[in-house]
Regions:
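Catalytic Walker B motif of ABC-type/P-loop ATPase nucleotide-binding domains
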Residues: 151-155
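The feature captures the beta-strand-to-loop junction immediately N-terminal to the Walker
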Residues: 34-36
Length: 220
């Protein structure tokens, strides 16, 4: 398995916010996390990303343990509550700041990913003047521009109009076909059922239901 979440529990100040969660995925699959606000979707993504450490259990990527103190073993793209962009920079310049120090993405590739999310690479419009939908599109572009092995998208449809949702579906399909594992959270049943190979329903930090596309749903 490329991704393994093994019996992960997270407690904060004595409160259990993630309870004994396990899931796994091979490459080239889309995993949906579904639940209302506060159900634990974002916290689980933070645990998978290594931004925070589990109280119990392990997250493994390609057999390597992920933790706050160990560099992420494979490339990672993240949209969790939106990345921080500079207000006075354009979309193009913001992505250059992220990409160039790593040396993994060329200017042409940045232009291409901006076009994919339907933002004009030539626009000099400052980020602080972006609509919420434009900000979300830029966040998605930042998450996928390096074509990482694992992509975490937390509520990526927030602030997107219908064309934006279609754009997101196209990107998810493309990255899946490339072999990435995508974990996408949403409270929107229809969108997740459309794009996901399997869905985990969360309630109060616990998996209460697991369904695989084309199979009968199982209770957690």
């Amino acid at each position: 398995m490329f991704l393994e979440v093994k019996n992960v529990t997270k407690s904060i100040h004595g409160d259990v916010v993630i309870k004994n969660v396990s899931l796994c995925s091979e490459r080239g699959r889309v995993i949906g996390l579904r639940g209302i606000n506060g159900s634990g979707k974002t916290m689980l993504m933070r645990l998978i990303s290594g931004l925070i450490r589990p109280t119990k259990g392990q997250v493994l990527i390609d057999g390597e343990v992920v933790s706050k103190d160990i560099p992420f073993p494979k490339s990672l793209g993240v949209l969790i509550e939106g990345p921080a962009f500079l207000d006075d920079y354009s979309a193009m310049d913001n992505l250059k700041l992220i990409a160039y120090p790593k040396g993994k993405v060329t200017e042409d590739e940045i232009k291409a990913v901006l076009s994919e999310v339907r933002l004009d690479p030539k626009s000099r419009k400052k980020y602080k003047k972006f609509s919420l939908g434009m900000k979300q599109r830029l966040g998605i572009a930042a998450a996928v521009m390096e074509h990482p092995d694992l992509i975490l998208l937390d509520e990526p449809t927030n602030a997107l109009d219908e064309s934006g949702v279609d754009m997101l579906k196209d990107i998810v399909k493309k990255e899946k076909e490339r072999g990435a594992v995508l974990i996408v959270s949403s409270h929107d049943r229809d969108i997740l059922e459309d794009i996901s190979d399997e869905i985990y329903d969360l309630d109060q930090g616990e998996i209460v239901r697991h369904s695989i596309k084309g199979e009968k749903r199982s209770e957690g």
